[in-house]
Amino acid sequence: MGLSDGEWQLVLNVWGKVEADLGGHGQEVLIRLFKGHPETLEKFDKFKHLKAEDEMRASEDLKKHGTTVLTALGGILKKRGQHAAELAPLAQSHATKHKIPVKYLEFISEAIIQVLQSKHPGDFGADAQAAMSKALELFRNDIAAKYKELGFQG
């Protein structure tokens, strides 16, 4: 399930584009997540009241949280699969405090892929998409394993 060096390079190349505008990308990812899977919005007390897309776009808190999410994910991706130290506190908080099911991580992974396809079509071809999908699946599988260790059935 691991990625080759070439696959990691494809992932990190497009991630460089994401880091140039973490807020914009993060906001777009969360909007796609909430619009595509409205049930996920219920996990966010800060954002539950945001029903319309224009309200979401106007929310600085949503943009800040999107930046936080993608900053954490970027730190994990840059570890090229050697992310146990970065993953542990994230799994802990998402299992015990936020209670985020693994299914929701699948949903946000889909949103990330869609945003990258939309914003960077020239840099996110089929090979890069496949590599990113694989990297996000590795992340989800490792989070799920940590959840199990913590006794969270998410």
From Swiss-Prot:
Modified residues (Phosphothreonine): 68
PROSITE patterns with a match to the protein in the record: GLOBIN
Binding sites annotated in the UniProt record for nitrite: 65
All residue ranges annotated as the Globin domain in the record: 2-148
Family annotation (Pfam families): Globin
Binding site for heme b: 94
Major site of localization recorded for this protein: cytoplasm
Any one biological process term the GO annotation gives: removal of superoxide radicals
EC number, as in UniProt: 1.7.-.-, 1.11.1.-
Amino-acid positions noted as binding O2 in the UniProt annotation, renumbered to this chain: 65
UniProt keyword Iron present: yes
Gene Ontology MF, one: oxygen binding
InterPro entries found in the cross-reference section: Globin, Globin-like_sf, Myoglobin
A GO CC term assigned to this protein in UniProt: sarcoplasm
First-level EC class: oxidoreductase
Sites bearing Phosphoserine, chain numbering: 4
Record has Membrane as a keyword: no
Compartments in which it is found: Cytoplasm, Sarcoplasm
Family under the similarity heading: Belongs to the globin family.
Protein name: Myoglobin
Organism in which the protein naturally occurs: Lagostomus maximus (Plains viscacha)
Taxonomic placement: Eukaryota, Metazoa, Chordata, Craniata, Vertebrata
Protein encoded by which gene: MB
